């Protein structure tokens, strides 16, 4: 699995240390193990997880601005866990409302010794925003309008929303509330992954 990950990272142009690679593989192995009992993801094959979960998450890392992030509706830690491994200098709050997912995240935190994550069980609209975050991240969480509506209190004045999407969400962008502005839409290149991937970056401060 290490060889496959190294090749994928090379194709993606993402240089990582051996320690970071081993952490990512350990996370995949834990996800595969816990998935049998906890049903954390529909992806069953660890090699497929490397592409659809690991690479699909970390290709976003170069576009994140700031040091404090919150991953809303993180599920089993996607994209928050892979991003925290790639960006060890940043801090990631991993938010999910289901206890079994948060228990898994805490076990990952313990076994991988990840000091820059904080798993939290809470609904996003009930989670306090002090201090505010530099970025609010979501992957397959909600429409753009629902994301900014439910998470409007989380980013700081210069914070941003980072929405990971599949196909270009033109309809969602057209319907976005007027007080929010799409700063950029990045077409992401994920090696060995069929289908399109886009990152929508939305300014949190009102126009």
Curated annotation (Swiss-Prot):
It holds the Pfam family GidB. Coiled coil: none annotated. S-adenosyl-L-methionine binds at residues 73, 78, 124-125, 139. Its EC number is 2.1.1.170. CDD domains: AdoMet_MTases. GO terms for molecular function: rRNA (guanine-N7-)-methyltransferase activity. Its main location: cytoplasm. InterPro entries: rRNA_ssu_MeTfrase_G, SAM-dependent_MTases_sf. This is Ribosomal RNA small subunit methyltransferase G.
């Amino acid at each position: 699995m290490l060889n496959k990950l190294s090749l994928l990272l090379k194709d993606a142009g993402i240089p990582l240390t051996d320690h970071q690679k081993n952490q990512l593989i350990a996370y995949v192995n834990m996800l595969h193990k816990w998935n049998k009992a906890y049903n954390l993801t529909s992806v069953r094959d660890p090699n497929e997880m490397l592409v659809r979960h690991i690479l699909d998450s970390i290709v976003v890392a170069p576009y994140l601005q700031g040091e404090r992030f919150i991953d809303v509706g993180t599920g089993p830690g996607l994209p928050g866990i892979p991003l925290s491994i790639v960006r060890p200098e940043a801090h990631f709050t991993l938010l999910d409302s289901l206890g079994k997912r948060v228990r898994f995240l805490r076990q990952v935190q313990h076994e991988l010794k990840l000091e820059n994550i904080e798993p939290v069980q809470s609904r996003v609209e009930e989670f306090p925003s002090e201090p505010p975050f530099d970025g609010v991240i979501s992957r397959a969480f909600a429409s753009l309008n629902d994301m900014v509506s439910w998470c409007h209190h989380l980013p700081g004045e210069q914070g941003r929303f980072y929405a990971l999407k599949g196909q270009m969400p033109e309809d969602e962008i057209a319907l976005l509330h007027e007080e929010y502005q799409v700063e950029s839409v990045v077409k992401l290149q994920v090696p060995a992954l069929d289908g399109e991937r886009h990152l929508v970056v939305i300014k949190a401060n009102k126009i």
